[in-house]
Every structure is written in C-alpha cells, then in structure tokens.
UniProtKB/Swiss-Prot annotation:
Primary gene name: RRI1
Residue ranges, compositional bias (Polar residues): 319-341
Keyword Hydrolase attached: yes
Entries under SUPFAM superfamilies matching the protein: JAB1/MPN domain (SSF102712)
Any GO CC annotation of this UniProt entry: cytoplasm
InterPro entries, A to Z: JAMM/MPN+_dom, JAMM_MPN+_peptidase_M67A, MPN
Residues that bind Zn(2+): H164, H166, D177
Cofactor(s) essential for the protein: a divalent metal cation
CDD domains in the cross-refs: MPN_RPN11_CSN5
Name listed for the protein in its UniProt record: COP9 signalosome complex subunit 5
Length: 440
C-alpha cells in the first residue's frame, strides 16, 4: 500500500475506514475536541480572568457570611481536572482547588492533583497527601518576593475546595463525600466540592462536571446533612481567546511513544505464542502417531496369536474326532457278530468299563476352549473400540482448544498490527499536512 500518492483527505479517510482505534489513541483527540458549555446569562458573558482579578482587588472585606450560589472556574482548571481524571481511567482521583471568593461566587483559578490511594468507587487521602499539599502550596503560591511563585496580579490564591472523579456514575456526592465536604466547610469555609465524570465526558464530548456544597437541614429533633449544586461558569483569559480565534482548526494529537512500544511488544508476544502453539501441536501429533503405530502392532500380534490358537484347537478337535471313530469301529467288530462265543448279556462291567463313547468324553474340552477364546476376543474388541472412541474424543477436544487459542492469538496480532499501522499513518498524515500547508 503506497501512501506517497494519497492526499491528506484520503489519508484521513483511510484511517477512519480501516484503522479505527477505540482505545487510548483517541483519548487525546476527544479531550482536545471537548466542548465547554458556556453560561447563557448576559451578566456572565463578559467574564474574563483580568476582570475577575480587578474586581477581587477592589472588593472590600465584609463580615457578613455570604451564601455561595455560583462557582467561576477557569478553562485552565477545567482542562487540568479533565486531564487528571482521564489519565486515572476507572480509578478515582483527587486534587485541590486554588482561588478566592468574590461576593457570593467562588472563583477557581488553578488546581493540582494529590498522590492518593484510589479504587473504582473510593479515594483516600493519606498523611503523605496532606504533607505534599502543604509543601506544594508553600512552594508554588506563597512567594511574594518575586520568586518562583505564580503571579495573579497581586491576588493571593487560597485553598477554596477539592475535586475528585466519579468514573462512569455521574456527578453527585456520596455519603462519605458529604461528610468530607461538611467537615471542610466547618473548619475552612469557603470550600466547594467539584465532581467530574471522565468516562461520560469522553463519550459525550461535553465536560460532565458539577460543584456542590453541604447544608444542614433541621427537621423536628433530627438534623441531617444534605447538599446542593452550585451553578458553574467557565471563564477564560483574553490571551487565550485571541489565540483560539486565530489558530488553525487542527487537533494535534500528542504522540505517546509508550503506547506504540506496548503495541509492538504485544505483536511480538502474539507471534511467539503462536509459534509455541504450532510447535506443541506438532509434538503432540508425533506422539499420537507413535502411539497409534505401537497399538496397531500390538493388535496385529494379538490377531496372529489368536489365529495360531484357533489352528491348534481345530487340529486337536479333528484328532480327537478321528480317535473316537476308530474306537467305535473297533467296538462294533465285537458287538455286531451274533456267532461270537462271548455272551454279552452275562458279561459283568468292571470299574474300568464305560457306557459312554470316547467322542463325548474328548469333545467337551475343545468346546470349552473355543468358548473362552471367543469371549477373550470379544473383550479385546470392546476395549479396542473404547480406546478408539476415547482417542477420537481427545483428538476433537485438542483440536477445539487449538482452534480457540489460534483465533485469540490471531485477533491479538491483528489488533496490535492495526494500532501500529494507525500510529504510523497518523504521523505521516500530519507531516504531509504540514508540508502541503507551509510549502510555497
């Protein structure tokens, strides 16, 4: 497949049709194309970072406790929170919100994540997390001498809340979240809790985020803590707005060398496993052929032995029949003549005499031998047929397992190969786009 003659549009169509990747390669695209829903109220249309900072500096201190109804969050903070949550995947993440208050609004200017222990449904901040938070704030936000601290035009940033993720189960506060938020509101108010759902945000390409505060509701003698949602407004800097209006409508995908290397390792592992599967199958086939030939040889020996025994028994039977015939004829010589001087009626039988013929006496052992041989042969035939049946069942079972493993390995190989090809074609498509755009 030659790519040198294809245009950028054809390359993108090729990627869309043949190399559609459904995993981590599309996360950066979805994150960059995610839409932030703006507020529809006219009073918030002209919001900007500089106007909020100027209003903060002009604000007079008040002793009245405000009732917070809005959360103003910068686009930078939204992108950071979304990036942390998407990187966490199905595991919950947690972080701290930095900002200030403005009348009945909580303004979030920046944020940072915490090293926490998270699961799919819970996140716990240990002692090391709080130590990291104190050191980070002291290093990044508490420099007033023009050092490495972040400059927000004289406005001092404080901790105004925390954020965490709910992967796949929407934005709300659980019982543990309510207890944590209520404890923080009691000791370091103003404090707000922001919850983000990264999976639904990637699926819908709209930021799923909610801001919440707790309130103590009293009914009769029982007091219970509930929460309410604050309206969230996203603002941006004037510099970012100007850059957004003049930039090219192109989503630059950040290359992840580790994912490409992982796909290459998976491709190599699939090839090794497939080769091992074929070698083991050949070994089993050779062993079965050797076993089958040995069994056939043993059966041939048994057949030859049976034929020899049958021949010997038939020979003995014929011999015995000949002897009995001679004995009968010899007796008739004496009993058939009436002129014999021997009186047959007066003759007394001795203990050695017998009224039975030798044919009946000698015939019984040969019949018994034939019956035993027939029974032995039928038993051997039954065992041989049973062995052949078991062998056929084992053969079908082994063939089914081999086919299943082969299909799985072929699928893994094709998936890893498509990922690598998609990554390379994406790189070539961007280079081709830059060449066509900036070449005179």
């Amino acid at each position: 497949m030659s790519l040198s003659n294809k245009t950028v549009k054809e390359l993108r169509q090729l990627l869309k049709e043949r190399y559609t990747v459904e995993d981590e390669l599309t996360e950066s695209i979805a994150l960059s194309s995610m839409r932030f829903k703006p507020s529809q109220e006219p009073e918030f249309h002209a919001l900007s970072q500089s106007s909020l900072l100027k209003t903060k500096l002009k604000q007079q201190s008040s002793t009245d406790i405000p009732s917070y109804t809005h959360v103003l969050i910068s686009k930078l903070s939204c992108e950071k929170i979304t990036h942390y949550a998407v990187r966490g995947g199905n595991i919950e993440i947690m972080g701290i919100l930095m900002g200030f208050t403005l009348k009945d609004n909580i303004v979030v200017m920046d944020c940072f994540n915490l090293p926490v222990v998270g699961t799919e449904t819970r996140v716990n901040a240990q002692l090391e997390s709080y130590e990291y938070m104190v050191q980070y704030i002291d290093e990044m936000y508490n420099h007033n001498d023009g050092g490495d601290g972040r400059d927000y035009k004289g406005a001092k940033l404080n901790v105004v809340g925390w954020f965490h993720s709910h992967p796949g189960y929407d934005c709300w506060l659980s019982n543990i979240d309510i207890q944590t938020q209520d404890l923080n509101q009691r000791f370091q108010d103003p404090y707000v809790a922001i919850v983000v759902d990264p999976l639904k945000s990637l699926e819908d390409k709209i930021l799923r985020m909610g801001a919440f505060r707790t309130i103590e509701s009293k009914s009769d003698d029982n007091s219970a803590t509930s929460y309410y949602e604050l309206e969230t407004i996203i603002f941006d800097s004037e510099l970012n707005r100007a850059l957004f209006e003049t930039k090219l409508n192109l989503h630059c995908v950040i290359e992840d060398d580790e994912s490409e290397q992982i796909s290459l390792n998976r491709l190599i592992d699939s090839m090794k496993q497939y080769s091992y599967l074929m070698d083991s199958k050949n070994v089993r086939t050779r062993i079965k052929l050797a076993t089958t030939s040995e069994r056939v040889s043993n059966e041939n020996k048994k057949n030859i032995d049976y034929q020899n025994r049958s021949t010997r028994s038939q020979f003995c039977l014929n011999t015995q029949r000949g002897d009995s015939t001679e004995t009968s004829s010899f007796g008739s010589m004496f009993s058939g003549d009436n002129t014999s001087d021997v009186d047959m009626e007066d003759r007394n039988l001795t203990q050695f005499d017998s009224t039975d013929t030798s044919l009946c006496i000698n015939g019984e052992p040969s019949i018994h031998v034939n019956r035993v041989e027939r029974s032995s042969r039928s038993t051997d035939n039954f065992h041989n047929s049973k062995k052949r049946m078991n062998s056929n069942q084992e053969k079908c079972h082994d063939e089914g397992n081999d086919m299943l493993q082969r299909n799985v390995l072929e699928t893994d190989y094709a998936r890893a190969k498509n990922r690598i090809l998609a990554s390379k074609i994406k790189q070539y498509e961007r280079l081709r786009f830059y060449k066509d755009t900036f070449t005179l």
